[in-house]
From Swiss-Prot:
Functional note: Catalyzes the reversible adenylation of nicotinate mononucleotide (NaMN) to nicotinic acid adenine dinucleotide (NaAD).
Cited CDD domains: NMNAT (cd02165)
Lineage: Bacteria, Bacillati, Actinomycetota, Actinomycetes, Micrococcales
Gene transcribed to yield this protein: nadD
Keywords: ATP-binding, NAD, Nucleotide-binding, Nucleotidyltransferase, Pyridine nucleotide biosynthesis, Transferase
Matches recorded under Gene3D superfamilies: HUPs
Name of protein: Probable nicotinate-nucleotide adenylyltransferase
One Gene Ontology term from the biological process aspect of the record: NAD biosynthetic process
Amino acid sequence: MELTEKSRPRIGVMGGTFDPIHHGHLVAASEVAQSFDLDEVVFVPTGRPWQKGAVTPAEHRYLMTVIATASNPRFTVSRVDVDRIGPTYTIDTLRDLHEERPEAELFFITGADAIAQILSWRDVEELWKLAHFVAVSRPGHDLSISGLPQQDVSLLEVPALAISSTDCRDRVNRGMPVWYLVPDGVVQYISKHHLYRSVA
């Protein structure tokens, strides 16, 4: 029985805007991979996130994610959401990944703030069937899964890295450094492509 279960690839799915990707994302993915014995973590940059307004073009966010994850052999990046036309919904992401890897057991990695809103997500009942959800704690967030199916949701505390993409964008816009908040290659990409500079 144990051998049969383990013979199924265990794949983490780390969806996000990644605008920009930072060390907090990478640490969370690494901690979940270790705790849940994942074979791989697929980072999925959103195409056009339905819950957010203006974001950096998807191709920039995809390339920054590729740069940030390149040194970890367990990390890969998928274009499934970037190439989809229209808004990005988690249910579409998981359906597409399940179709690509029907033999895999999927673990969707999300933050405590997002898991609190999950009951408002599209086709939530199908979400539970497609993946196990892992909610990672962020500094200042209380984790609670009351009202959610306990067998489909796990909580995991990760090292407290108080980094946010919003703060990273703001620092760049104010001419402040983001070294050590985001991977070195991403810092260079942001500078080369003049991202997050205010045009107002």
